[in-house]
Amino acid sequence: GSEMCIRDRLYHSLLSPYLNVGLITADEVISAALKQFQKGKIPLSSCEGFIRQIIGWREYIHGIYWYFGEEYRHLNHFDSQRKLLPLFADSQKTSMVCVADAIKGIEKRSWVHHIPRLMVLSNLAMLADIKPSEFLSWMREVFIDAADWVMVPNVVGMSMHADGGKMSTKPYVAGGAYISRMSNYCSSCKYNPKERTGEKACPFT
């Protein structure tokens, strides 16, 4: 197993679709987590990590969305102009195991964990020089938790670094070695993360 290949819903609350559109509130979720901790049902580290995601990262993203305003979604720091690759619409159109697995997750559930979203899908879009607005539109269409206020900062600011560093200090870009180290995808892939050129060279490398 690995961080990227853990079973689909293990260790994940799957609350983001409900939180992001306001069907439940952050306060309700945090209160429920605290009650479970107080009853001794969950360890402190799990409770703290979960609450940090809710009142830390989630609220930061919400603030970024409103602080930078409507123009933020149109930023394109690297002037990337390529259209979305066909593989983003069909898991059968790539031999890259990590990418195919992430796309299959979308096809099956309209959801994948944030790590493959960032380090596989977004990483590929950035390395392939995809136009940020194209990638943002796709993310908004395919993910069940894709509220506008969530996706605009996550894609423009973090995934594509299209804001030139207003939100994050550096682009989240990684090569095949990172994916190999953090997952078990590469062992069954036709591409070799250690090769940069040739037919078996990993596109991420």
What are these regions (language model features)?
Residues 12, 16, 21-205:
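C-terminal catalytic domain of photolyase/cryptochrome flavoproteins
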